[in-house]
């Protein structure tokens, strides 16, 4: 209970601070501008940026326009039949077993433009897995974890220069899977997905920086996220797992501006650290840390201005102390705006 209060207060304070900055009186020109000007936003929205699905493994860097809503159904799966050892190595060097893991993790993500600079979101999920480990088989289907998300964009890209957009990302993970008595999958993670990966069934507070630059016909996005893993409890004792770092680097090549058809090359990494931000020694989980490096080719296109689709498959290319897996995935966006016209983020 203390942990959830702490995280809830942290998220509330961040939202309150950034909303106050939005509503405050204009800041003198010689001071630092906490948000882009109306002229900068207008210039950006008139530049090349065709409506399309966008990245699969990353939330859009630029925020929703005020009053615009998106709801996304995301189906992410995992097929893992070999494992990496204690040294970082390529997928070709992974060894069969000892865990064979098959997972499907559907989620529904919603995001809404509170202002032209702040976007609020939430994500709920389910998780099913089938696994064999050392001859023992397990399977489970249940609720996944719930994420509360806020994005704040203090800098918007300038089409006339090299300046990119810069967005601050905050995510609070609530362990609804644990509250619903869902069983943890081997390794303690659901499949790598659109949101920064966190440990299944545990509180987590993620802070991240995201950036994007459009260079017709290419869009380039990158991000880094740090997740603080809250202390857990087992048999009346506190447990401490390592914090987690996620990174993304994504290239989108839009081939048809009208249909939003294009292909993506997306690089995703997940690192389990051997330390914690609070300084506690690690006494649970993978104490030696782990690394997963993957590359995903994907296709994206629009059925209409309201329905946007992407399909891809993430392939693990290297890893350490982790399962060597492939991750087929499908993503569908439904977009809505009170004015009837969808604006690309």
What function would you assign to each model-found segment?
Residues 54-56, 67-69, 104-108, 144-150, ...:
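Hydrophobic, lipid-facing positions within transmembrane beta-strands of outer-membrane proteins
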Residues 32, 59-68, 117, 156-166, ...:
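Short loop/turn motifs that connect adjacent beta-strands in outer-membrane beta-barrel proteins
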Residues 82-94, 238-345:
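Outer membrane beta-barrel transmembrane domains
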Residues 66-82, 189-190, 194-282, 334:
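Detector for outer-membrane/organellar transmembrane beta-barrel domains
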Residues 62-64, 112, 124, 152-154, ...:
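Residue-level signature of outer-membrane beta-barrel architecture
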Residues 125-241, 287:
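Outer-membrane pore/translocation modules
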Residues 73-77, 122-126, 166-174, 222-228, ...:
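Transmembrane beta-barrel strands of outer-membrane/channel proteins
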Residues 39-48, 76-105, 136, 191, ...:
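Surface-exposed strand-loop-strand hairpins of Gram-negative outer-membrane beta-barrel proteins
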């Amino acid at each position: 209970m203390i942990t959830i209060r702490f995280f809830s207060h942290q998220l509330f304070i961040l939202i309150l601070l950034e909303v106050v900055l939005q509503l405050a009186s204009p800041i003198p020109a010689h001071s630092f501008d906490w948000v882009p000007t109306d002229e900068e936003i207008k210039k950006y929205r008139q530049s090349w940026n065709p409506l399309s699905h966008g990245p699969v493994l990353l939330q859009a860097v630029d925020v929703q326009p005020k009053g615009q809503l998106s709801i996304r159904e995301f189906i992410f799966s995992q097929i893992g039949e070999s494992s990496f050892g204690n040294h970082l190595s390529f997928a070709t060097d992974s060894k069969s077993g000892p865990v064979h893991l098959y997972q499907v993790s559907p989620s529904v993500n919603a995001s809404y433009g509170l202002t032209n600079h702040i976007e609020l979101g939430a994500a709920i999920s389910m998780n099913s897995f089938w696994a064999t480990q050392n001859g023992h088989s397990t399977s489970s289907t249940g609720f996944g974890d719930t994420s509360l998300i806020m994005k704040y964009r203090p800098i918007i890209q300038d089409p006339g220069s090299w300046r990119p957009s810069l967005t601050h990302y905050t995510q609070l993970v609530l362990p609804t899977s644990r509250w619903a008595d869902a069983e943890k999958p081997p390794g303690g993670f659901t499949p790598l997905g659109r949101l920064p990966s966190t440990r299944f069934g545990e509180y987590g507070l993620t802070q991240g920086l995201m950036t994007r630059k459009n260079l017709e016909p290419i869009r380039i996005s990158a991000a880094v996220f740090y997740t603080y893993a809250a202390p857990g409890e087992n048999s009346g004792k506190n447990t401490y797992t390592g914090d987690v770092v996620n990174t993304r680097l994504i290239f989108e090549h839009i081939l048809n501006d009208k249909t939003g058809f294009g292909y993506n090359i997306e690089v995703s990494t997940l690192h389990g650290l051997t330390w914690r931000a609070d300084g506690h020694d690690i006494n649970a989980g993978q104490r030696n840390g782990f690394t997963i490096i993957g590359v995903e080719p994907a296709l994206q296109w629009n059925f209409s201005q309201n329905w946007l689709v992407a399909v891809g498959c993430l392939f693990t290319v290297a890893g350490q102390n982790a399962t060597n897996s492939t991750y087929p995935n499908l993503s569908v966006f439904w977009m809505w705006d009170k004015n009837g016209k969808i604006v690309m983020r």
